[in-house]
Amino acid sequence: TYENGKAVINQDICKGCGRCIGACAFDAIENQNWNANEILGRKMAEYSQAVCDGRPTFHISLVRDISPNCDCHGENDAPILPDVGIFASFDPVALDQACVDACLHATPMPNSQLSDNLADPHWHHHHDNFLDSNPNVRWKETLEHAEKIGLGTREYELIQMK
């Protein structure tokens, strides 16, 4: 909606999808709720649960061109990590956890936002490639919530194929 000639989020009808924030290339729209990223992550898990509930599903993740911001950001920077691989699972939560774990063990790409942050002596190191690239990322809370609501489990067995 509009107030005083500016676009604002109407919290009464907002579904929490974050699409408006991601679509704005100028960061002109921001949620006034400091927990917005955590709420968005929970909503993504809940929407995934609604789609998958009671249906047989199989999930594939191509872990490549890992950008510092959400893929929906039009102004994204160069990849922060090298291509990690292709992952597949019947369990979407286990799949995402396996992908995250692989990314956490990957070496940052040179001259990326992540490597620049890590080289900055004033940067607070999180020892997490995603948080060290963007401290607003809430991947852990999203996966914890997904597991809590029964979407899947964060436990997995990694079988490597060559």
Regions found by a protein language model. Name each.
Residues T1-K162:
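Extended, low-polarity segments enriched in aliphatic/aromatic residues
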